[in-house]
């Protein structure tokens, strides 16, 4: 018997999402306009909370759908305007270009990356040393590449590893649905679960590594570039200005990596199962024997393109997204990928997230129009000069954990610059505030996927459900890093930032503009 029209509509609405989730979203959509009529400020914060809820439930339903419905309603009822949303999208065009082209560009370097990381994984047997290697590699790469690019690299490698073993475990040679475990017997499932734990820990170490390295340079994160421009700093200036905070944080972050692996805390410490190592070793040996001269040329070309990528980003020869586009063009041209459908596959991972980030910019527009952060900014600027640095760091950290890093960093640096230009603070104080804002925006935000775009990208990627990496588990595994990075960063802002910066000036390494 065919179901009723109403039941059919209910089933189609948000598809396979749980009924309670669908009901919650409908309640949000009904309540928001009513509260907006009473208090736009409260309605604005409620919208932010609801959007965070959709992100937290990313595995129930991709946040683009519920978040998009909330954003459309916000524009319709007047919480912001379509014109302001367009302005926010235009202001963040380089971030969108990064997502569209750089992440897609990495897709065409997968062979090289899988080759390198397979060798790394098979040659280092110590889990502590392997975790440290992944963390250091991610930190180094994210000092030159955007964190999203680095995470995209590690995701592609992890999916490759998982796919190799899953095909063996399911006794199928052809491409199968990696989420389908129905053909895997109990013994293989136990090993597969251990392998998932191993990959989860590596992904989290690499993700935190991107935060450790990304905060250090002006090209490491999009907001770093905005802050560097506002302060008038170049690549070397930015690195030295940040180093009184970022170098101690990097050291403590790497020590935390070793500690959680050694003590098996917070879901870390899972080793690579020997059976999986054997499968990966066989795959590596087989790949080496089957590798033709044409395949070797592809690897060499991809390595050369990798050098171009790092060089172009370090020297900032063009916008990050345009450099990514050049990688796509060079990689496809020189490795023989000419079919439109083959090229199109490169964009399947990044475009849903690009759309989600565009929806988030509409929430950012609401935050600006309803002046949700104004009370916090006014409170900070009323404090003493010394207290301002710690307060900027703390409030940046709190807001960055629930909001967009680029937005938070931009808002605070603009407010600080306006205060400097009005004479409320000195140029020297403004430059110290810029460091506090940058480190406060980057370091505590590892607490949740909402704060780090790279973490959110990981959470909503095809890999997350494969290795059972949920929002809650990600927050739990990030907790030791959150505590260490936040507290060490705060202590450095409080005690070492001003004296070390003063010493750099006396040495002539940096100068106030």
From Swiss-Prot:
Keywords: Antiport, Cell inner membrane, Cell membrane, Ion transport, Membrane, Sodium, Sodium transport, Transmembrane, Transmembrane helix, Transport
Spans through the membrane: 23-43, 52-72, 97-117, 120-140, 144-164, 202-222, 238-258, 303-323, 348-368, 391-411, 447-467, 475-495
Listed InterPro entries: Na+/H+_antiporter_NhaB (IPR004671)
Membrane topology category: Multi-pass membrane protein
GO molecular-function terms, A-Z: sodium:proton antiporter activity
GO cellular component, one term: plasma membrane
Cellular compartments annotated: Cell inner membrane
Pfam families in the cross-refs: NhaB
Catalytic activity: 2 Na(+)(in) + 3 H(+)(out) = 2 Na(+)(out) + 3 H(+)(in)
Function field: Na(+)/H(+) antiporter that extrudes sodium in exchange for external protons.
PANTHER family: NA(+)_H(+) ANTIPORTER NHAB, TRANSPORTER ARSB-RELATED
Family that this chain belongs to: Belongs to the NhaB Na(+)/H(+) (TC 2.A.34) antiporter family.
Protein name: Na(+)/H(+) antiporter NhaB
Organism: Escherichia coli (strain 55989 / EAEC)
């Amino acid at each position: 018997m065919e179901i009723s029209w109403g039941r059919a509509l209910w089933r189609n609405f948000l598809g396979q999402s749980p009924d309670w989730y669908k009901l919650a979203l409908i309640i949000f959509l009904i309540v928001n306009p009513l509260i907006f009529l009473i208090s736009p400020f409260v309605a604005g914060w409620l919208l932010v909370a609801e959007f965070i809820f959709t992100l937290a439930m990313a595995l129930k339903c991709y946040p683009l759908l519920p978040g998009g419905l909330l954003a459309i309603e916000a524009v319709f009822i007047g919480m912001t305007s379509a014109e302001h949303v367009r302005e926010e999208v235009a202001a963040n065009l380089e971030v969108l270009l990064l997502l569209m082209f750089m992440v897609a560009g990495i897709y065409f370097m997968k062979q090289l990356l899988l080759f390198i990381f397979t060798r790394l994984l098979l040659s280092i047997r110590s889990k502590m040393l392997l975790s440290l290697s992944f963390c250091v590699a991610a930190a180094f790469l994210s000092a030159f590449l955007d964190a999203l690019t680095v995470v995209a690299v590690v995701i592609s490698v992890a999916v490759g590893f998982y796919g190799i073993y899953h095909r063996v475990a399911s006794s199928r040679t052809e491409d199968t649905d990696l989420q389908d475990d129905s053909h895997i017997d109990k013994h293989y499932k136990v090993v597969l679960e251990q392998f998932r734990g191993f990959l989860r820990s590596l992904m989290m170490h690499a993700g935190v590594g991107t935060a450790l390295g990304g905060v250090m340079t002006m090209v490491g994160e999009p907001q770093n570039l905005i802050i560097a421009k506002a302060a008038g700093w170049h690549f070397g200036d930015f690195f030295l200005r940040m180093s009184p905070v970022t170098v101690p944080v990097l050291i403590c972050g790497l020590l935390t990596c070793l500690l959680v692996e050694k003590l098996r805390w917070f879901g870390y410490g899972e080793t690579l199962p020997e059976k999986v190592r054997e499968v990966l070793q066989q795959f590596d040996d087989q790949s080496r024997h089957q590798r033709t001269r044409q395949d070797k040329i592809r690897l060499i070309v991809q390595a050369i393109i990798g050098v171009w990528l790092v060089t172009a980003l370090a020297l900032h020869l063009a916008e990050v997204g345009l450099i990514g586009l050049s990688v796509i063009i060079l990689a496809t041209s020189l490795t023989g990928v000419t079919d439109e459908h083959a090229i199109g596959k490169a964009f399947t991972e990044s475009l849903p997230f690009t759309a989600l980030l565009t929806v988030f910019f509409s929430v950012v527009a609401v935050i600006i129009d309803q002046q949700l952060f104004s009370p916090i900014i006014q409170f900070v600027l009323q404090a003493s000069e010394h207290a301002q640095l710690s307060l900027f760091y703390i409030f940046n950290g709190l807001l960055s954990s629930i909001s967009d890093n680029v937005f938070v960093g931009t808002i605070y640096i603009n407010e600080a610059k306006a205060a400097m230009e009005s004479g409320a603070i000195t140029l020297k104080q403004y430059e110290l505030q810029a460091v506090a804002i940058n480190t406060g925006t980057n370091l505590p935000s590892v607490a949740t996927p909402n704060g780090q775009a790279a973490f959110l990208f990981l959470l909503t990627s095809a890999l997350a459900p494969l290795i059972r990496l949920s929002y809650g588990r990600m927050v739990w595994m990030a907790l030791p890093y959150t505590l260490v990075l936040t507290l060490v960063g705060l202590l450095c802002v409080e005690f070492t930032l001003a004296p070390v910066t003063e010493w750099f000036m006396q040495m002539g390494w940096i100068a106030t503009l």
